[in-house]
């Protein structure tokens, strides 16, 4: 008559089976073709001149706009930001002041938020997070957000808005 296995062996075997059941199986092992990761364009720095090329004037170009130095691809909102659309004036530039003031006045279509009221700054943060970050992919940053005028690093840069990406995909 066979002796029953000691309990520790059964527990070890059960733990091993459970661990193997919970480990994800790579798709190549499962006989599936791996799908490429769904990624947008690589994140990059934009000068004012480069960003201006994406102002919605060219039919075959994406439409970019920046708020708080973060560049968003708003092409999916072409009816709002494309050529002749109501908010086209915001496209192709950092229009943080205009967004904060809810203004399309050319004097307000700038990155400069100096002199804005607390209420306007709160409105800017609200639109930034609830509209742009919630709806549109981040494709980069304005050079001004990362660098000072003299080329030195901007110590006020906070990477909280930076999307997760692999550096190898950026070059």
Curated annotation (Swiss-Prot):
InterPro entries: Cyt_B5-like_heme/steroid-bd, Cyt_B5-like_heme/steroid_sf, MAPR/NEUFC/NENF-like. One of its GO terms (molecular function) is metal ion binding. Residues 1-30 form the signal peptide. Pfam families: Cyt-b5. The keyword Cytoplasm does not apply. GO terms for cellular component: endoplasmic reticulum; extracellular space; mitochondrion. In the embryo, expressed most abundantly in brain and spinal cord. Widely expressed in adult tissues including brain, heart, lung and kidney. In brain, expressed in neurons but not in glial cells. In the hypothalamus is expressed primarily in the paraventricular nucleus (PVN), with lower levels of expression in the arcuate nucleus (ARC). It is found in: Secreted, Extracellular space; Mitochondrion; Endoplasmic reticulum. The keyword Membrane does not apply. The modification N6-acetyllysine is found at residue 135. GO terms for biological process: MAPK cascade; negative regulation of appetite; positive regulation of MAPK cascade. Keywords: Acetylation, Endoplasmic reticulum, Heme, Iron, Metal-binding, Mitochondrion, Secreted, Signal. Transmembrane segments: none annotated. Residues 43-128 form the Cytochrome b5 heme-binding domain. SUPFAM superfamilies: Cytochrome b5-like heme/steroid binding domain (SSF55856). Belongs to the cytochrome b5 family. MAPR subfamily. Non-classical progesterone receptors involved in extranuclear signaling are classified in 2 groups: the class II progestin and adipoQ receptor (PAQR) family (also called mPRs) (PAQR5, PAQR6, PAQR7, PAQR8 and PAQR9) and the b5-like heme/steroid-binding protein family (also called MAPRs) (PGRMC1, PGRMC2, NENF and CYB5D2). Interacts with PINK1 and PARK7. PANTHER family: MEMBRANE-ASSOCIATED PROGESTERONE RECEPTOR COMPONENT-RELATED, NEUDESIN. The cytochrome b5 heme-binding domain was proven to bind heme, although it lacks the conserved iron-binding His residue at position 81. Acts as a neurotrophic factor in postnatal mature neurons, enhancing neuronal survival. Promotes cell proliferation and neurogenesis in undifferentiated neural pro-genitor cells at the embryonic stage and inhibits differentiation of astrocytes. Its neurotrophic activity is exerted via MAPK1/ERK2, MAPK3/ERK1 and AKT1/AKT pathways. Neurotrophic activity is enhanced by binding to heme. Also acts as an anorexigenic neurotrophic factor that contributes to energy balance. This is Neudesin. It comes from Mus musculus.
């Amino acid at each position: 008559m066979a002796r029953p296995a000691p309990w520790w062996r059964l527990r070890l075997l059960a733990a091993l089976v459970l661990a193997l059941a919970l480990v994800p199986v790579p798709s190549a092992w499962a006989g599936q073709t791996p799908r490429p990761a769904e990624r947008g364009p690589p994140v990059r720095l934009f000068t004012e001149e480069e960003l201006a090329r994406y102002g919605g004037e060219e039919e075959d170009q994406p439409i970019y706009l920046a708020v708080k130095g973060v560049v968003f691809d708003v092409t999916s909102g072409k009816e709002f930001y494309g050529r002749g659309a109501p908010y086209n004036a915001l496209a192709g530039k950092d229009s943080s002041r205009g967004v904060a003031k809810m203004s399309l006045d050319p004097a307000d279509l700038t990155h400069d938020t100096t002199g804005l009221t607390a209420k306007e700054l709160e409105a800017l943060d609200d639109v930034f997070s609830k509209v742009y970050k919630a709806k549109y992919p981040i494709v980069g940053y304005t050079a001004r957000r990362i660098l000072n005028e003299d080329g030195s690093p901007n110590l006020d840069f906070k990477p909280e808005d930076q999307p997760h990406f692999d550096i190898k995909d950026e070059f």
